[in-house]
């Protein structure tokens, strides 16, 4: 019996010393949720509603010199009551050298400062209108909402270190299918997107971006043919982000036909082939790590003319219960000239959110 007890104990000890592979130990699970209430008094279309803005579940890991990420999203992307679950990120990145990191898979397009910003960190009820329309969210071309992402390959890096070792220049360039997330290339023509920015002082970035490509599967209403439409875009960006002070401004311009709204695959010739927009915002601490005040001015013109400009003047607060739980509130006065009746151009908008991370 003593011999059996010894053997059992030895066997138990062997089981407790099983070594877990390093790549398994490196896997991290995280996520976040965004709960929302919105109301507006647009004449003839007043509404208010609770909404589940976003939920994401994320796996991050590392295998040698390669980082990887898989991210699934649940959202009411089509509006309240129409939930969508989809894979948004799936990529690996070779990170051995800071001056040349190579990413392959499905990930954020290399366009603008705001696009890759975490939606909670971004601090507002939504990304700016011009980002949504010209950076692959609810894209002007009619591409389905892709969260600013596509499938492809990207090279990026930080170079030109100063005397303190801080790099002064960042570059990034990518080649993508051009169709958004979870879709193969439909016309064998790739999108090329690139950008670069200088970092003259800690916390400051000044950059520019360019994008040329196409989108397939669009209907020409004149001929009835299915065609590809061009995407030629550029952006200028500036940002200061340090010690809880965040200021950012961007201007985007697009040339190329489109439907004007996500999910619509028919060219809308009436709005022309150009669009542009801009935003400027500031978020500042009122109570450090607890309460921030914010203001944003933004405009989007779907035909690059003032007769169809939509402008929002926004103010609000972000209150942090903890680092992982916050409440956001904002009020906006909206001037929407895409509404046919001039007497209905102006209305009020309110958004409140409870956001959490885990």
Protein language model regions, located:
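Cleavable N-terminal export/targeting peptides
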Residues: 1-20
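Outer-membrane beta-barrel pore domains
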Residues: 42-45, 91-93, 103-106, 115, ...
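Charge-dense, low-complexity intrinsically disordered segments
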Residues: 142, 183, 269
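Interfacial loop-to-helix transition and helix-capping segments at the boundaries
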Residues: 183-189, 273-275
């Amino acid at each position: 019996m003593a011999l059996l007890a010894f053997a059992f104990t030895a066997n138990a000890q062997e089981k407790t010393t099983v070594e877990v592979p390093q790549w398994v130990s490196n896997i991290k699970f995280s996520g976040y949720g965004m709960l929302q209430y919105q109301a507006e008094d647009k004449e003839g279309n007043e509404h208010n509603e609770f909404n589940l803005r976003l939920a994401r579940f994320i796996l991050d890991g590392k295998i040698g010199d390669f980082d990887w990420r898989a991210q699934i999203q649940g959202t009411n992307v089509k509006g309240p009551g129409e939930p969508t679950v989809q894979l948004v990120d799936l990529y690996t990145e070779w990170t051995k050298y800071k001056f040349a990191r190579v990413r392959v898979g499905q990930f954020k397009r290399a366009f603008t400062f705001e696009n890759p910003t975490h939606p909670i960190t971004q601090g507002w009820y939504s990304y700016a209108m011009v980002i949504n329309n010209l950076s692959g969210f609810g894209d002007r071309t009619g591409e389905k909402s892709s969260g600013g992402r596509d499938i492809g390959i990207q090279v990026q890096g930080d170079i030109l270190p100063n005397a303190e070792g801080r790099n002064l220049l960042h570059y990034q360039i990518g080649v993508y299918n051009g169709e958004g997330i979870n879709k193969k290339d439909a016309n064998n023509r790739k999108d090329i997107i690139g950008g670069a920015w200088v970092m003259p002082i800690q916390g400051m970035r000044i950059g520019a971006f360019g994008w040329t490509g196409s989108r397939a599967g669009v209907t020409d209403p004149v001929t009835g043919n299915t065609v590809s439409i061009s995407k030629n875009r550029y952006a200028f960006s500036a940002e200061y982000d340090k010690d809880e002070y965040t200021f950012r401004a961007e201007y985007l311009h697009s040339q190329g036909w489109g439907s004007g709204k996500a999910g619509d695959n028919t060219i809308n010739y009436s709005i022309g082939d150009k669009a542009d927009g801009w935003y400027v915002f500031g978020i500042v601490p009122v109570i450090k790590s607890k309460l921030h005040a914010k203001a944003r001015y933004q405009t989007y013109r779907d035909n690059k003319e003032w007769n169809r400009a939509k402008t929002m003047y926004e103010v609000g607060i972000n209150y942090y219960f903890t680092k992982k739980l916050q409440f956001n509130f904002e009020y906006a006065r909206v001037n929407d000239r895409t509404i046919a009746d001039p007497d209905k151009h102006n209305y009020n908008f309110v958004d409140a959110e409870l956001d959490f991370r885990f």
